[in-house]
Amino acid sequence: MKSHEPFIEPESTYYVYSPSLLGRSMFFYPLTCGHFFYAPGYHLHRASFDSFLLIYVKKGSMYVQTKDESFDAKADEFILINCYEPHSYGTKTGSECLWCHFDGPLAKNFFESIVSHLGTVFSIGNPAPATNKLEAIIDSFCRSLIKEALLSKYINDILTSFLLYSAADKKNDSTDMIET
């Protein structure tokens, strides 16, 4: 689909998805995802949008405001937001981003663990495994090849790569949780 929001460039695309009852009960699942080109001045504020949001900044920069803090993100950084809480994000300079609103039975647990170790805005040594999976999610919708178990696996792979990076590079309590 094409967005008609102000400050979203026309080449931007996004997809909306409603998972099955089985998918909601046992999988990670995307709700909306896309590849956006934001013009300078884009800003969005929400009191809530029941999901978690993963953004990968391919080019440019973004700013993020959660209920407690403000952050800046630049190219090759990820942003992870709990959209159940008030939040804002936008860009002053323009940016190109891959993004996915997702949820699932374990989404909050993964979110809390990742953010507690990496923060809301973070980079990882090699973003390609995570960005390739994010692109695969978007491509699944583009090609109308929707397989809930596979979409869940892609989201799980992305989140797990963040946890493994956290454990490997932060050497903290999460290592015991991840390595058994």
Predicted features, each with a name:
Residues 43, 117-123, 144-145, 169-170:
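Short, polar/flexible loop-turn hinges at active-site or ligand-entry regions and domain interfaces
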Residues 97, 107, 134-141, 155-162:
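Hydrophobic alpha-helical core bundles mediating ligand binding, dimerization, or RNAP-core interactions
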Residues 29-32, 53-56, 129-133, 154, ...:
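Amphipathic, well-ordered alpha-helical segments in soluble domains
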Residues 113-135:
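Aromatic/histidine-rich interaction motifs
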Residues 24-118:
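N-terminal regulatory/effector-sensing and dimerization cores
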Residues 127-139, 151-155, 166-180:
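A short, Lys/Arg-enriched amphipathic alpha-helix from helix-turn-helix/homeodomain DNA-binding modules
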Residues 37-40, 83, 138-145, 162-169:
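A general structural signal marking secondary-structure boundaries and capping sites
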Residues 1-29, 140, 146, 167:
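A short, N-terminal "cap"/entry segment at the start of jelly-roll beta-barrel domains
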